Design a protein with these regions (language model features):
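Acidic, Ser/Thr/Pro-rich beta/coil linker or hinge segments at domain junctions
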Residues: 13-14, 336-380
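Helix N-cap motif at beta-to-alpha junctions
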Residues: 321-326
Length: 380
Protein backbone atom coordinates (compact mmCIF):
# COMPACT_ATOMS: atom_id res chain seq x y z
CA UNK A 1 0.00 0.00 0.00
CA UNK A 2 1.16 3.51 -0.81
CA UNK A 3 2.51 4.98 2.49
CA UNK A 4 0.65 8.21 1.76
CA UNK A 5 -2.66 6.37 1.41
CA UNK A 6 -1.91 4.38 4.56
CA UNK A 7 -1.27 7.63 6.42
CA UNK A 8 -4.56 9.09 5.18
CA UNK A 9 -6.42 5.97 6.30
CA UNK A 10 -4.81 6.08 9.74
CA UNK A 11 -5.71 9.75 10.09
CA UNK A 12 -9.29 9.05 9.06
CA UNK A 13 -9.49 6.24 11.64
CA UNK A 14 -8.23 8.53 14.42
CA UNK A 15 -10.69 11.24 13.42
CA UNK A 16 -13.49 8.69 13.40
CA UNK A 17 -12.60 7.56 16.92
CA UNK A 18 -12.52 11.16 18.12
CA UNK A 19 -15.91 11.85 16.57
CA UNK A 20 -17.36 8.70 18.19
CA UNK A 21 -16.17 9.73 21.65
CA UNK A 22 -17.45 13.26 21.17
CA UNK A 23 -20.84 11.99 20.13
CA UNK A 24 -21.31 10.64 23.64
CA UNK A 25 -21.80 14.23 24.63
CA UNK A 26 -19.36 16.03 26.93
CA UNK A 27 -21.64 18.83 28.06
CA UNK A 28 -20.62 22.15 29.53
CA UNK A 29 -23.17 22.85 32.26
CA UNK A 30 -21.37 25.61 34.18
CA UNK A 31 -22.28 29.27 33.74
CA UNK A 32 -18.96 30.51 35.14
CA UNK A 33 -15.33 29.46 34.79
CA UNK A 34 -14.15 27.32 37.71
CA UNK A 35 -10.72 26.02 38.70
CA UNK A 36 -11.83 22.61 37.41
CA UNK A 37 -11.89 24.04 33.91
CA UNK A 38 -8.11 24.41 34.12
CA UNK A 39 -7.35 21.07 35.76
CA UNK A 40 -7.12 18.98 32.59
CA UNK A 41 -10.05 16.65 33.36
CA UNK A 42 -13.62 16.37 32.16
CA UNK A 43 -14.46 19.99 32.91
CA UNK A 44 -11.45 21.15 30.88
CA UNK A 45 -12.39 18.88 28.01
CA UNK A 46 -15.96 20.17 28.04
CA UNK A 47 -14.77 23.78 28.00
CA UNK A 48 -12.39 23.15 25.11
CA UNK A 49 -14.96 21.16 23.11
CA UNK A 50 -18.01 23.33 23.70
CA UNK A 51 -16.41 26.78 23.65
CA UNK A 52 -13.18 26.75 21.66
CA UNK A 53 -13.43 23.88 19.17
CA UNK A 54 -17.06 24.59 18.37
CA UNK A 55 -16.45 28.33 18.43
CA UNK A 56 -13.51 28.40 16.02
CA UNK A 57 -14.65 25.43 13.95
CA UNK A 58 -11.75 24.27 11.80
CA UNK A 59 -10.24 20.91 10.95
CA UNK A 60 -6.80 21.50 12.46
CA UNK A 61 -8.17 22.46 15.88
CA UNK A 62 -10.63 19.59 15.96
CA UNK A 63 -7.80 17.07 16.13
CA UNK A 64 -6.89 18.41 19.61
CA UNK A 65 -3.22 17.50 19.34
CA UNK A 66 -0.39 19.31 21.14
CA UNK A 67 0.38 21.31 18.01
CA UNK A 68 -1.56 22.37 14.96
CA UNK A 69 0.04 20.50 12.06
CA UNK A 70 -0.71 21.47 8.47
CA UNK A 71 1.10 21.26 5.12
CA UNK A 72 3.46 24.04 4.12
CA UNK A 73 1.41 24.33 0.94
CA UNK A 74 -1.54 25.46 3.06
CA UNK A 75 0.56 28.09 4.80
CA UNK A 76 1.71 29.36 1.42
CA UNK A 77 -1.87 29.41 0.21
CA UNK A 78 -1.41 26.70 -2.42
CA UNK A 79 -4.12 24.06 -2.76
CA UNK A 80 -3.03 20.57 -1.78
CA UNK A 81 -3.72 19.16 -5.26
CA UNK A 82 -1.25 21.67 -6.71
CA UNK A 83 1.57 20.55 -4.42
CA UNK A 84 3.52 18.87 -7.24
CA UNK A 85 3.41 22.10 -9.24
CA UNK A 86 5.14 24.01 -6.46
CA UNK A 87 8.86 23.84 -7.21
CA UNK A 88 10.14 24.96 -3.82
CA UNK A 89 9.68 27.45 -0.99
CA UNK A 90 12.90 29.36 -1.63
CA UNK A 91 11.02 32.47 -2.73
CA UNK A 92 9.69 33.10 0.77
CA UNK A 93 10.78 33.68 4.33
CA UNK A 94 8.70 32.85 7.39
CA UNK A 95 7.72 35.58 9.84
CA UNK A 96 6.48 34.90 13.36
CA UNK A 97 5.14 37.31 15.97
CA UNK A 98 3.53 37.03 19.38
CA UNK A 99 1.70 39.46 21.65
CA UNK A 100 -0.30 39.36 24.89
CA UNK A 101 -3.49 41.29 25.58
CA UNK A 102 -4.61 42.49 29.01
CA UNK A 103 -6.88 45.38 28.03
CA UNK A 104 -9.25 46.71 30.69
CA UNK A 105 -12.20 46.67 30.20
CA UNK A 106 -12.39 43.61 27.96
CA UNK A 107 -15.20 45.23 25.94
CA UNK A 108 -14.94 48.83 24.78
CA UNK A 109 -16.56 50.99 22.09
CA UNK A 110 -15.47 49.65 18.71
CA UNK A 111 -14.06 46.32 19.85
CA UNK A 112 -13.10 43.84 22.55
CA UNK A 113 -10.11 41.87 23.79
CA UNK A 114 -10.84 38.95 21.45
CA UNK A 115 -10.95 41.09 18.33
CA UNK A 116 -7.89 43.00 19.51
CA UNK A 117 -5.92 39.79 20.08
CA UNK A 118 -6.36 38.69 16.49
CA UNK A 119 -5.94 42.08 14.85
CA UNK A 120 -2.85 42.97 16.86
CA UNK A 121 -0.84 39.92 15.85
CA UNK A 122 -2.07 40.05 12.24
CA UNK A 123 -0.93 43.68 12.08
CA UNK A 124 2.50 42.96 13.56
CA UNK A 125 3.04 40.41 10.80
CA UNK A 126 1.61 42.61 8.05
CA UNK A 127 3.79 45.66 8.73
CA UNK A 128 6.80 43.34 8.69
CA UNK A 129 5.97 42.59 5.06
CA UNK A 130 4.42 39.22 5.83
CA UNK A 131 1.17 37.77 4.55
CA UNK A 132 -0.46 36.46 7.78
CA UNK A 133 -1.62 32.85 7.56
CA UNK A 134 -2.17 31.13 10.92
CA UNK A 135 -2.33 32.16 14.58
CA UNK A 136 -2.50 30.52 18.00
CA UNK A 137 -4.63 31.57 20.95
CA UNK A 138 -3.65 31.16 24.61
CA UNK A 139 -6.13 32.10 27.36
CA UNK A 140 -5.62 32.96 31.02
CA UNK A 141 -9.09 32.83 32.59
CA UNK A 142 -9.98 34.11 36.03
CA UNK A 143 -12.17 31.88 38.14
CA UNK A 144 -15.71 33.28 38.02
CA UNK A 145 -15.58 34.61 34.45
CA UNK A 146 -19.04 34.08 32.91
CA UNK A 147 -18.93 31.39 30.22
CA UNK A 148 -21.16 33.64 28.12
CA UNK A 149 -18.43 36.30 28.13
CA UNK A 150 -15.86 33.74 27.04
CA UNK A 151 -18.09 32.53 24.20
CA UNK A 152 -18.55 36.12 23.06
CA UNK A 153 -14.79 36.69 22.86
CA UNK A 154 -14.21 33.40 21.06
CA UNK A 155 -16.79 34.46 18.48
CA UNK A 156 -15.14 37.88 18.22
CA UNK A 157 -11.82 36.17 17.51
CA UNK A 158 -13.37 33.91 14.90
CA UNK A 159 -15.00 36.87 13.14
CA UNK A 160 -11.77 38.89 13.21
CA UNK A 161 -9.76 35.94 11.89
CA UNK A 162 -12.18 35.43 9.01
CA UNK A 163 -12.00 39.12 8.09
CA UNK A 164 -8.20 39.01 8.16
CA UNK A 165 -8.00 35.77 6.18
CA UNK A 166 -6.16 33.78 8.86
CA UNK A 167 -6.91 30.56 10.73
CA UNK A 168 -6.66 29.87 14.45
CA UNK A 169 -4.94 26.47 14.48
CA UNK A 170 -3.82 25.84 18.06
CA UNK A 171 -4.39 27.15 21.56
CA UNK A 172 -4.22 26.65 25.31
CA UNK A 173 -6.30 27.52 28.36
CA UNK A 174 -5.32 28.07 31.98
CA UNK A 175 -7.52 29.09 34.93
CA UNK A 176 -6.24 31.13 37.89
CA UNK A 177 -8.02 31.61 41.25
CA UNK A 178 -10.35 34.55 41.62
CA UNK A 179 -8.34 37.67 42.43
CA UNK A 180 -5.18 36.34 40.73
CA UNK A 181 -6.14 37.72 37.33
CA UNK A 182 -8.63 40.16 35.87
CA UNK A 183 -11.34 38.33 33.95
CA UNK A 184 -9.46 37.35 30.81
CA UNK A 185 -5.99 37.64 29.30
CA UNK A 186 -5.16 36.39 25.79
CA UNK A 187 -1.88 35.65 24.04
CA UNK A 188 -1.72 35.15 20.30
CA UNK A 189 1.18 34.15 18.08
CA UNK A 190 1.09 34.27 14.32
CA UNK A 191 3.00 32.97 11.32
CA UNK A 192 3.11 34.58 7.91
CA UNK A 193 5.11 34.36 4.71
CA UNK A 194 7.33 37.11 3.33
CA UNK A 195 8.17 37.21 -0.39
CA UNK A 196 11.92 37.69 -0.73
CA UNK A 197 11.28 40.65 -3.03
CA UNK A 198 10.10 42.66 -0.03
CA UNK A 199 12.91 44.55 1.65
CA UNK A 200 11.43 46.55 4.51
CA UNK A 201 13.60 48.00 7.23
CA UNK A 202 15.16 51.08 8.74
CA UNK A 203 18.27 50.41 6.64
CA UNK A 204 16.21 51.14 3.51
CA UNK A 205 15.16 54.65 4.62
CA UNK A 206 16.78 57.60 2.82
CA UNK A 207 16.91 61.35 3.30
CA UNK A 208 13.99 62.98 1.46
CA UNK A 209 11.61 60.03 1.90
CA UNK A 210 8.09 60.83 3.03
CA UNK A 211 6.33 59.72 6.23
CA UNK A 212 2.71 58.63 5.80
CA UNK A 213 0.03 57.27 8.12
CA UNK A 214 -2.85 55.05 7.04
CA UNK A 215 -5.45 56.80 9.19
CA UNK A 216 -6.34 58.93 12.20
CA UNK A 217 -4.43 58.45 15.45
CA UNK A 218 -5.28 58.06 19.15
CA UNK A 219 -8.82 56.64 18.83
CA UNK A 220 -8.09 53.28 20.47
CA UNK A 221 -6.35 54.53 23.58
CA UNK A 222 -8.94 57.21 24.26
CA UNK A 223 -11.82 54.78 23.61
CA UNK A 224 -10.49 52.44 26.29
CA UNK A 225 -9.94 55.33 28.71
CA UNK A 226 -13.52 56.52 28.26
CA UNK A 227 -14.87 52.97 28.66
CA UNK A 228 -13.32 52.62 32.12
CA UNK A 229 -15.69 55.22 33.52
CA UNK A 230 -13.05 56.60 35.88
CA UNK A 231 -13.13 60.07 34.38
CA UNK A 232 -15.54 62.94 34.82
CA UNK A 233 -15.89 63.29 31.06
CA UNK A 234 -17.66 61.16 28.47
CA UNK A 235 -17.04 61.02 24.74
CA UNK A 236 -18.39 58.59 22.10
CA UNK A 237 -14.96 57.61 20.79
CA UNK A 238 -14.62 54.22 19.08
CA UNK A 239 -11.47 52.15 18.93
CA UNK A 240 -9.88 51.85 15.50
CA UNK A 241 -9.07 48.15 16.00
CA UNK A 242 -8.95 46.41 12.64
CA UNK A 243 -6.63 44.19 10.63
CA UNK A 244 -4.47 46.28 8.31
CA UNK A 245 -3.09 43.46 6.16
CA UNK A 246 -5.31 44.39 3.20
CA UNK A 247 -4.10 47.99 3.41
CA UNK A 248 -0.50 46.83 3.59
CA UNK A 249 -0.89 44.52 0.61
CA UNK A 250 -2.49 47.33 -1.36
CA UNK A 251 0.36 49.70 -0.52
CA UNK A 252 3.11 47.19 -1.31
CA UNK A 253 1.40 46.29 -4.57
CA UNK A 254 1.20 49.93 -5.68
CA UNK A 255 4.52 51.06 -4.17
CA UNK A 256 6.87 48.06 -3.94
CA UNK A 257 9.69 50.49 -3.07
CA UNK A 258 8.06 51.16 0.33
CA UNK A 259 10.98 51.44 2.75
CA UNK A 260 9.62 50.76 6.24
CA UNK A 261 6.38 50.18 8.16
CA UNK A 262 5.24 49.96 11.77
CA UNK A 263 1.88 49.82 13.51
CA UNK A 264 1.80 52.55 16.14
CA UNK A 265 0.42 50.71 19.16
CA UNK A 266 1.72 51.30 22.69
CA UNK A 267 3.57 54.60 22.84
CA UNK A 268 1.75 55.84 19.76
CA UNK A 269 3.07 57.49 16.64
CA UNK A 270 5.63 59.56 18.55
CA UNK A 271 7.37 56.49 19.91
CA UNK A 272 7.64 54.57 16.62
CA UNK A 273 8.98 57.65 14.83
CA UNK A 274 11.65 58.05 17.52
CA UNK A 275 12.60 54.41 17.13
CA UNK A 276 12.95 54.97 13.38
CA UNK A 277 15.07 58.09 13.88
CA UNK A 278 17.42 56.27 16.26
CA UNK A 279 17.70 53.24 13.97
CA UNK A 280 18.53 55.33 10.89
CA UNK A 281 20.61 58.05 12.52
CA UNK A 282 18.55 60.53 10.48
CA UNK A 283 16.02 63.13 11.54
CA UNK A 284 12.24 63.05 11.18
CA UNK A 285 10.32 66.28 10.54
CA UNK A 286 6.53 66.09 10.86
CA UNK A 287 3.77 68.68 10.63
CA UNK A 288 1.21 68.90 13.43
CA UNK A 289 -1.64 70.01 11.16
CA UNK A 290 -1.05 67.13 8.73
CA UNK A 291 -1.57 64.40 11.34
CA UNK A 292 -5.21 63.21 11.24
CA UNK A 293 -6.90 63.29 14.65
CA UNK A 294 -10.68 63.14 15.05
CA UNK A 295 -12.16 66.21 16.75
CA UNK A 296 -13.74 64.20 19.58
CA UNK A 297 -10.48 62.40 20.26
CA UNK A 298 -8.44 65.59 20.21
CA UNK A 299 -10.90 67.25 22.59
CA UNK A 300 -10.68 64.38 25.06
CA UNK A 301 -6.88 64.44 24.88
CA UNK A 302 -6.82 68.19 25.49
CA UNK A 303 -9.08 67.89 28.54
CA UNK A 304 -6.86 65.19 30.03
CA UNK A 305 -3.59 66.87 29.13
CA UNK A 306 -2.52 63.96 26.90
CA UNK A 307 -0.69 64.43 23.60
CA UNK A 308 -2.46 62.28 20.96
CA UNK A 309 0.84 61.50 19.30
CA UNK A 310 1.65 59.22 22.26
CA UNK A 311 -1.74 57.47 22.44
CA UNK A 312 -2.03 53.84 21.29
CA UNK A 313 -3.60 52.83 18.00
CA UNK A 314 -4.80 49.40 16.90
CA UNK A 315 -5.88 49.87 13.29
CA UNK A 316 -3.42 52.22 11.60
CA UNK A 317 0.22 52.10 10.60
CA UNK A 318 3.04 54.45 9.70
CA UNK A 319 5.16 53.96 6.59
CA UNK A 320 8.08 55.53 4.77
CA UNK A 321 7.86 55.78 0.97
CA UNK A 322 10.01 57.46 -1.69
CA UNK A 323 9.06 61.10 -2.24
CA UNK A 324 8.09 60.51 -5.88
CA UNK A 325 5.71 57.71 -4.84
CA UNK A 326 3.84 59.44 -2.02
CA UNK A 327 0.84 60.45 -4.15
CA UNK A 328 0.44 56.90 -5.46
CA UNK A 329 0.69 55.54 -1.92
CA UNK A 330 -2.00 57.89 -0.59
CA UNK A 331 -4.35 57.34 -3.53
CA UNK A 332 -4.05 53.58 -3.04
CA UNK A 333 -4.69 53.66 0.70
CA UNK A 334 -7.58 56.12 0.46
CA UNK A 335 -9.34 53.83 -2.01
CA UNK A 336 -9.35 50.94 0.50
CA UNK A 337 -11.59 50.40 3.55
CA UNK A 338 -9.84 51.76 6.63
CA UNK A 339 -7.44 53.92 4.64
CA UNK A 340 -9.74 56.81 3.77
CA UNK A 341 -7.88 59.22 6.07
CA UNK A 342 -4.35 58.33 4.97
CA UNK A 343 -2.06 61.35 5.08
CA UNK A 344 1.43 62.58 4.30
CA UNK A 345 2.67 63.91 7.64
CA UNK A 346 6.36 64.65 7.13
CA UNK A 347 9.72 63.70 5.72
CA UNK A 348 13.11 62.21 6.53
CA UNK A 349 15.82 64.85 6.98
CA UNK A 350 19.53 64.93 7.76
CA UNK A 351 19.33 66.91 10.99
CA UNK A 352 18.71 66.89 13.87
CA UNK A 353 20.22 63.42 13.83
CA UNK A 354 18.30 60.59 15.53
CA UNK A 355 15.53 63.00 16.55
CA UNK A 356 11.93 63.85 15.72
CA UNK A 357 10.84 67.47 15.27
CA UNK A 358 7.27 68.69 14.89
CA UNK A 359 6.33 71.90 13.10
CA UNK A 360 3.39 73.33 15.06
CA UNK A 361 0.28 75.02 13.73
CA UNK A 362 1.83 78.39 14.66
CA UNK A 363 5.00 77.78 12.66
CA UNK A 364 7.21 76.96 15.62
CA UNK A 365 8.98 73.67 16.28
CA UNK A 366 9.13 71.30 19.22
CA UNK A 367 10.99 68.10 19.90
CA UNK A 368 9.00 64.88 20.03
CA UNK A 369 10.79 62.66 22.52
CA UNK A 370 10.19 59.05 23.46
CA UNK A 371 7.18 58.47 25.71
CA UNK A 372 8.07 58.70 29.39
CA UNK A 373 6.03 56.62 31.85
CA UNK A 374 2.70 55.00 31.05
CA UNK A 375 -0.19 57.48 31.06
CA UNK A 376 -2.61 54.89 29.64
CA UNK A 377 -1.92 51.48 31.24
CA UNK A 378 -3.56 48.28 29.96
CA UNK A 379 -4.87 49.70 26.71
CA UNK A 380 -4.04 46.56 24.70
Amino acid sequence: MDPKNRLNQDEAKVNSNIARVRSRGMKLKDEYVTLSHGAGGKASAALVEQVFVSGYGNRVLEELTDAGVLPLTEILGVFAEDEDALADFSGYKLAMSTDSYVVNPIVFPGGSIGELAVNGTVNDLAVSGAIPKVISAGFILEEGLPIADLRREVQAMRDAAEKAGVRIVTGDTKVVPKGSGDKLFINTAGIGIVPLSRQLGADQVQRGDRIIVSGAIADHGMSVMMARGDLAIEAPIKSDTRAVNCLVEGLLGAVPQTRWMRDATRGGLGTVLNELAVATGLGIAIEDESIPVHDMTRGACDMLGIDPIYVANEGMFCAVVPADQVDTALETLRALPGGEEAANIGRVVSKPESSVVMVTAFGGTRMIDMLVGDPLPRIC
